[in-house]
A protein has these predicted regions:
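Short glycine-aspartate micro-motif
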Residues: 1
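Short acidic, Gly/Ser-rich segments with clustered Asp/Glu that frequently serve as metal-coordination loops
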Residues: 4-8
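Helical "lid/coupling" subdomains associated with nucleotide-phosphate turnover
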Residues: 10-25, 29-45, 51, 55-186
Length: 186
């Protein structure tokens, strides 16, 4: 789960959480890097540049000039993506290290699933696959019904939606005694 303020690493085995760790750095660190690298002096503008023009791989980026909002300055998109890729590599390598610490890194036969706002970075799955040697895909939430369904399909909300679906399943389960209450009936 590539969040703004942290990265959550979970390893599942046989449908159960086998390993769970949270790294205290997230994708918002990229905003600060862009802010510093290009002397923007406004983290919000840096975040907007990242969201609009950012990518995970410099090699995939077609170089062009990008105007920094509300200024007369331009930067090269290659330079912007270089800053973003450098930080993403650091963050992803930290997540990979945590997966290795779980003791079952080599057994990730089903690959790695990404979620969270950071999973929306163009090419993030290619970068993570390259760094980890595992297949990488994106988590999806099924059967979401809401007034604004399109916005709920964003990976930013997947953790919350997953928890809500689990809660819904728990509510639907019958609460009467379970199998043991019928064990002694004649």
């Amino acid at each position: 789960d590539l969040g703004a303020d942290s990265i959550k690493v979970q390893v599942f085995q046989d449908g159960l959480v086998y390993f769970d760790e949270e790294l205290p750095l997230g994708c918002s660190t990229i905003d600060g890097d862009i802010n510093t690298a290009f002397s923007i002096n406004d983290v919000e503008k840096a975040r907007k540049l990242k969201e609009e023009f950012g990518m995970a791989l410099r090699a995939s980026c077609k170089n062009r000039k990008i105007m920094i909002p509300d200024t007369k300055y331009c930067i090269d998109s290659h330079d912007l993506v270089h800053v973003e890729q450098s930080r993403l590599e650091e963050l992803l390598e930290g997540a990979i290290f945590q997966m290795q610490e779980s003791g079952c890194y080599e057994d990730l036969d089903d690959g790695i699933l990404l979620t969270g706002g950071g999973s929306q970075v163009v090419g993030i799955e290619v970068l993570l696959s390259k760094l980890s040697g595992h297949s990488v895909g994106f988590a999806k939430v099924a059967s979401v019904k809401a007034d604004r369904e399109a916005s709920l399909k964003s990976p930013v909300y997947f953790t919350a939606l997953g928890l809500l679906q689990c809660e819904r399943r728990e509510v639907k389960k019958p609460k009467s005694g379970g199998w043991f209450s019928n064990f002694f009936k004649e």
